[in-house]
Amino acid sequence: MTATAQQLEFLKNSIKSIQDYPKPGILFRDVTSLLEDPKAYTLSIELLVERYKKAGITKVVGTEARGFLFGAPVALGLGVGFVPVRKPRKLPRETIAETYELEYGTDQLEIHVDAIKPGDNVLVVDDLLATGGTIEATVKLIRRLGGKVTDAAFIINLFDLGGEQRLEKQGITCYSLVPFPGH
């Protein structure tokens, strides 16, 4: 099932836009409204599974927190394991960490050291691509463990914030279901 224009428009219309959230001047794209609609949520998962079902994916990685909501069902649809990437001190076993830049400071992500095996073909899934910093850090973690990452999938791409270009420089092909301007 290739995504039709009608299906993609349905998904786009299921995402509410909230003006001046979380601060004045921001138009927030609320993917939780898509999650509230079982038809939209199911369709988004089905379209991602269809795109990657013949790609030889061996693991799906999702980044905290909304990446879990899309990554885990995609992993199930592909018949592979799901690996969460989380904020510091949220994973119980031994982890490695990657620090990345935020607009005002830095943050860190962690992954279990035994979650990715050398040679795993990994798909990264998240709800939204903006500047790409979080996904770039996630990709670095996977590669440090020997995993191969060439693709990342998103529900929303805020296309004018530069995330796709940033990830392409890291050898990552980005796919998103719904493009929106970021400003």
From Swiss-Prot:
InterPro entries: Ade_phspho_trans, Adenine_PRTase, PRibTrfase_dom, PRTase-like. It is an enzyme of class 2 (transferase). Transmembrane segments: none annotated. Disulfide bonds: none annotated. The keyword Nucleus does not apply. Catalyzes a salvage reaction resulting in the formation of AMP, that is energically less costly than de novo synthesis. This is Adenine phosphoribosyltransferase.
